[in-house]
């Protein structure tokens, strides 16, 4: 069976509250996670909430990485979606868990774009 990509949905618990509330650090580890998995970073956008929490996205040529943090709970919700076989989303997910000092990670992989038969991609100008 063919698929277009792999999507990791990670629940990351027991993280350091100060780390989860540090926008610059979160941005750096997200970009580093993408690079360590072999992805090509295209764009980055992060936001620090008041009084706490950070959300962000790293757009990669292969798709995206996102994070939403709840420092008061020591929790981060992370998605890593990669298209093709060149990049391993688990490498990025595991690196993030390590850098967040996570005590527990629960993650699920979802195959995206599952097709019974090969799909021909047509150019939009045809």
Swiss-Prot record:
Entries under NCBIfam families matching the protein: SAM_DCase_Bsu
Protein name: S-adenosylmethionine decarboxylase proenzyme
Active-site residue numbers: 63 (schiff-base intermediate with substrate), 68 (proton acceptor), 83 (proton donor)
Annotated EC: 4.1.1.50
Cellular component annotations (GO), alphabetically ordered: cytosol
Cofactor binding description: Binds 1 pyruvoyl group covalently per subunit.
Statement: the UniProt record of this protein carries the keyword Membrane: no
Species: Clostridium tetani (strain Massachusetts / E88)
The family this protein is said to belong to: Belongs to the prokaryotic AdoMetDC family. Type 1 subfamily.
